[in-house]
């Protein structure tokens, strides 16, 4: 079946770097863009941006342009989110989500990972 499997929870100190993986299976990886979504505790979902899985070109939302990097290992059907110089406000659950369906001028994310929780604590 189609699924996105994310790496496990992370505990990091402020200033460190974290890299989260999202492994796709059950479909052709390069046919669908991959989005990243942040959910801080008690907050709603925030779209961070996406990476074109065919060209490798990333697009970042305005608030996620500085310390965040999307990358791919296409041969392993895996997308990555790296966060550098971690801050307290980065403590959240991060989801990968496949860009799947375009309807009525809106893109819908049709397959989601289970999420990776990042805890930032000194």
Label the model's feature ranges.
Residues 1-122:
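Extracellular domains of the immunoglobulin superfamily
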